[in-house]
Amino acid sequence: MKQGTVKWFNAEKGFGFIEVEGENDVFVHFSAINQEGYKSLEEGQSVEFEVVEGDRGPQAANVVKL
């Protein structure tokens, strides 16, 4: 699992990016967020996640808010 910080997340569109120190930003889709109900992330929030290979490159999976 990697740790990072939410760079930005557009709740209306359901996606954003997670910043990982010393690495490229990682795309995150709302469906990858592990929580019940409304799934969203806040800018600056710390998260833990796995990186998987998506259609357009690396993306976050199993995202957990810290």
UniProtKB/Swiss-Prot annotation:
Residue spans making up a coiled coil are: none
Please name the source species.
Answer: Staphylococcus saprophyticus subsp. saprophyticus (strain ATCC 15305 / DSM 20229 / NCIMB 8711 / NCTC 7292 / S-41)
Where it sits in the cell: the answer is: Cytoplasm
Keyword annotations of the record? Cytoplasm
Purpose of the protein: Involved in cold stress response.
Single GO term (MF): nucleic acid binding
User: What is this protein identified as?
Assistant: Cold shock protein CspA
Instruction: Write down the PANTHER family for this protein, in alphabetical order.
Output: COLD SHOCK DOMAIN CONTAINING PROTEINS
Name the InterPro entries for this protein. Cold_shock_CspA (IPR012156), Cold_shock_domain (IPR050181), CSD (IPR011129), CSD_CS (IPR019844), CSP_DNA-bd (IPR002059), NA-bd_OB-fold (IPR012340)
Q: What is its main location?
A: cytoplasm
Spell out the CDD domains in the cross-references: CSP_CDS (cd04458)
